[in-house]
Amino acid sequence: MADKQISLPAKLINGGIAGLIGVTCVFPIDLAKTRLQNQQNGQRMYASMSDCLIKTIRSEGYFGMYRGAAVNLTLVTPEKAIKLAANDFFRHQLSKDGQKLTLPKEMLAGCGAGTCQVIVTTPMEMLKIQLQDAGRIAAQRKILAAQAQLSAQGGAQPSVEAPAPPRPTATQLTRDLLRNHGIAGLYKGLGATLLRDVPFSIVYFPLFANLNQLGRPSSEEKSPFYVSFLAGCVAGSAAAVAVNPCDVVKTRLQSLERGVNEDTYSGFLDCARKIWRHEGPSAFLKGAYCRALVIAPLFGIAQVVYFLGIAESLLGLLQEPQA
């Protein structure tokens, strides 16, 4: 990507198209990942990704799997555009006379891209996590209320079902966070997001560039689209699993609502320490399989759109009548 100059509007459009397609395809898996990561050992409601999705459909309907998708679809365009364009920019700045970047420089470019994207990623994930996890907490409270009613009635079937609490909306959450905490409320978990996204980009972009280079027919030609797709999938899933422990901590820190008897956390280290002590080291890999399934096609699609130059074609069509 460093050897090809692409206009800023094209970068933004390519990133936006890729993000919208990717999020639409994999959002239910991302919802399962959030709920699996947030459930603590004493309050397990879901045994696996498929179990989570089946229970979500039964209790919340098909569209329950897309809770929080509107936030992602709105903000994923600037997020993906910033990430891809920033990496392209840093690679170009670090390259000299079109020479191939060394691995340290590739990692530095990825670091810059990961740092830039958290401007959008942190508030996006902050809102998305509340909306995604609301169904899990509501279901848990409903089960506990039914159990309490059964106990109070001596085992008799409860006659009246407790009404479900109203679901929060992204607008309500944003308004409440800004009113109570200011702009800092939307950026809760910023440090954890940086610790996840910067290492992710350091791993992803150099790995993708080298895998993509392997499938290039010659130094003068672009890689075929399927090579870019596979390179994006492999690099994305590898980077996603590598930083999953930080993603678990970030998800826990950004969750405002807690289930019954669930731990609260004062910061990154406190959260990591409590997870290790109460749930064991395997808890840091919760949702890793889901995250790999989300990230692989997301970045595979992104790289295909980026390398096919869909935005350049669209911009070219718009400019043709003026020629």
From Swiss-Prot:
Species of provenance: Mus musculus (Mouse)
Protein name: Mitochondrial glutamate carrier 1
PANTHER family in the record: MITOCHONDRIAL 2-OXODICARBOXYLATE CARRIER 1-RELATED (PTHR45678), MITOCHONDRIAL GLUTAMATE CARRIER 1 (PTHR45678:SF3)
Function: Mitochondrial glutamate/H(+) symporter. Responsible for the transport of glutamate from the cytosol into the mitochondrial matrix with the concomitant import of a proton. Plays a role in the control of glucose-stimulated insulin secretion.
Family annotation (Gene3D superfamilies): Mitochondrial carrier domain
GO process annotations (BP): L-glutamate transmembrane transport; regulation of insulin secretion
Gene Ontology MF terms: amino acid:proton symporter activity; L-glutamate transmembrane transporter activity
SUPFAM superfamilies per record: Mitochondrial carrier (SSF103506)
Catalysed reactions listed for this entry: L-glutamate(in) + H(+)(in) = L-glutamate(out) + H(+)(out)
Keywords noted in UniProt: Membrane, Mitochondrion, Mitochondrion inner membrane, Repeat, Symport, Transmembrane, Transmembrane helix, Transport
Family: Belongs to the mitochondrial carrier (TC 2.A.29) family.
Lineage: superkingdom: Eukaryota
UniProt main location, coarse: mitochondrion
Topology of the protein relative to the lipid bilayer: Multi-pass membrane protein
GO cellular component term of the entry, any: mitochondrial inner membrane
UniProt Solcar repeat ranges: 6-93, 101-214, 223-312
